[in-house]
Each structure stands twice: as structure tokens, then as C-alpha cells.
């Protein structure tokens, strides 16, 4: 039976429906009811967002709660994005109109700003499109991460790291290979990308070349990824790409209300990143990671704190 793609009129998720008669379909993401009208053909064209702001400072901030998805639901990710947005605008000089925010907050009514797989893919393309020397780009993701079997043979642990969009059960995850191809490889000379990834299994989710890790014992270690396994060229086009992540590829992340005084849930990693940047402007990357680890290890009665690790992942052709 022929099928077509439509978008949920409440949350923007992609739905696969028969191309035949008018019917009502329940969205698996938000459980909203959608009246589906007949199509003149087997497929309808997907919506394309029209982000038309291109400046020297741009950011994509994505926070996903997975509302209604049983045990998958998170509490602090939308707060993480709101905090990161405030930090970039107030303290880093990013124009509000140059920050694209995607959340599944029930107050968000724009279907193109719902964090579906398609919308995240389009947002990443917008982030890098037309970038040039001197540009500062930020990609922040707060949500679920996972690992999938590596089908291309370029992973030492035989697993691809992925981020999970809100419709991942229907549309699948976004692989590290795709993230690298979209926002890392096209990065031009003189441009800089910072990715802050607050999710499980996020250590090498941008597939960058160098991993600089702070061990639990406080030692710094360097690891050059490419010589250990045969990999295609995943370098930038001359720019600098930096990913700061809260987990190794085999670790899980954590939410907690402790860091906000019990007022609201936040991602421990995102909170510690913003707190450190606000209190120690101009610090080195090494000091940033050390300070973040100290903050999280200071969370009272939290078993996650003793396991916390940070990775600084780096790629450059400059």
C-alpha cells in the first residue's frame, strides 16, 4: 500500500500514513489526533524550514524531554537549552535571531522547531551554511544518546555514537558519521565550532580526531583516533572543531535538581559548563574541564558524581 509523509499538526513529528482516504491518525510522539486529508499523489513533500539569518555568531540549541515516551522521559533538557540561550545572548554576544532553538516543550507551537530527526538535520545544515573565517558556531544537544552497530568499519569499538531525536523510534537516530559530514567537514579555515553535548555515549559523537580526557584520578591523556583504525578523512576544511562532552562513549549522563538548589532539574554537565564559564571567563580548556568535574563531584549524595568524566575532543587542519 502506498504511503506518504505528513507532519503532526500538534508537535511536528513525521507521520507515515496511507495515501488513501481521509482518516484520523494518532501521533506516537505527542499522542495528538490528526485528521489526514487525501493526497493527489503517493508522497507529499516534507516541509523545509526557511532560516534566513546568517551572521558571524550562530548557534543551534536542541533540548528534548521525550514527553510521553514512558521511561525515556527527561526533566531538565529544556531548562538546559534555556540556560544556554541566556548564556550565549547575555555573556557571549550572540544575537537572539541567530540562535535556533529546537525543543519538545509543549509551549512550542512551531512545527519546524520541534526536535524531529528532519528538523535537527536541517538545523545543522543551517548552522554551517555560508560560514567563513572569523565565524563562531555553537551546537548544543541535551537529550538521549546511544550506540549502534558500526556498519562502515570506522569505529574502534565497532559502535557508532548517535543522538536521539524525539521521533527516533519512527525515523531512527542521527549517527556520528552524519554529524561529522554535516557540521565538521565543511568547516572553513578561520571558523570555529564548539559542540557541547550533554547525553549518554557522547564522547566521540562528532567523530573528531583527537580526544583529550581527564581521568578519574586527575590525569590528562591524549588519544589520536585515526591511526588506531582505518577511517575516511573526517577532518575539517581548515577550521577548528571542538566538542566538549560529559561522557565517554561507554558512559551515561545524569540529571539532578541539586545544582539548582532543588528548584528545577538540569543536566549536570550543561549546568557545570555554564557555571564555570560565568565564574571564570577566559579560562583554558583544561581548567574548564577540571572545574566542571569539581562542581559535579561536589553534588551531595549523588552516586553519579564519583563516576563523572569529561572529554575534550578536538579536530583541526589549521
Language model regions located:
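Cysteine endopeptidase catalytic domains of the caspase/legumain-like
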Residues: 2-318
Amino acid at each position: 500500500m502506498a504511503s506518504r509523509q505528513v507532519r503532526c499538526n500538534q508537535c511536528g513529528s513525521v507521520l507515515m500514513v496511507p495515501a488513501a482516504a481521509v482518516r484520523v491518525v494518532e501521533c506516537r510522539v505527542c499522542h495528538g489526533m490528526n485528521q489526514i486529508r487525501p493526497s493527489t499523489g503517493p508522497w507529499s513533500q516534507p516541509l523545509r524550514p526557511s532560516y534566513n539569518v546568517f551572521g558571524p555568531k550562530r548557534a543551534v540549541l536542541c533540548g528534548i524531554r521525550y514527553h510521553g515516551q514512558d521511561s525515556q522521559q527527561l526533566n531538565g533538557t529544556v531548562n538546559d537549552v534555556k540556560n544556554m540561550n541566556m548564556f550565549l545572548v547575555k555573556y557571549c554576544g550572540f544575537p537572539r535571531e541567530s540562535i535556533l532553538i529546537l525543543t519538545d516543550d509543549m509551549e512550542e507551537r512551531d512545527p519546524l522547531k520541534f526536535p524531529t530527526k528532519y528538523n535537527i538535520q536541517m538545523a545543522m545544515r543551517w548552522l554551517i551554511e555560508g560560514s567563513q573565517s572569523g565565524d563562531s558556531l555553537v551546537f548544543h544537544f541535551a537529550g538521549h544518546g546511544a550506540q549502534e552497530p558500526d556498519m562502515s568499519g570506522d569505529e574502534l569499538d565497532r559502535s557508532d555514537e548517535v543522538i536521539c531525536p524525539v521521533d527516533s523510534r519512527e525515523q531512527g537516530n542521527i549517527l556520528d558519521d552524519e554529524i561529522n559530514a554535516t557540521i565538521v567537514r565543511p568547516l572553513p579555515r578561520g571558523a570555529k565550532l564548539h559542540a557541547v553535548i550533554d547525553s549518554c555515549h557522547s564522547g566521540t559523537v562528532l567523530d573528531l580526531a583527537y580526544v583529550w580526557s581527564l581521568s578519574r584520578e586527575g590525569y590528562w591523556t591524549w588519544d589520536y583516533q585515526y591511526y588506531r583504525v582505518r577511517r575516511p578523512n573526517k577532518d575539517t576544511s581548515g577550521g577548528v572543531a571542538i566538542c566538549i562532552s560529559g561522557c565517554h562513549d561507554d558512559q551515561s549522563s545524569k540529571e539532578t535538581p541539586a545544582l539548582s538548589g532543588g528548584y528545577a532539574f538540569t543536566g549536570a554537565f550543561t549546568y557545570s559548563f555554564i557555571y564555570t564559564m560565568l565564574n571564570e571567563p577566559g579560562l583554558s580548556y583544561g581548567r574548564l574541564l577540571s572545574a566542571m568535574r569539581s562542581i559535579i563531584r561536589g553534588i551531595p549524595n549523588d552516586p553519579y558524581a564519583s563516576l563523572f568524566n569529561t572529554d575534550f575532543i578536538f579536530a583541526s587542519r589549521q
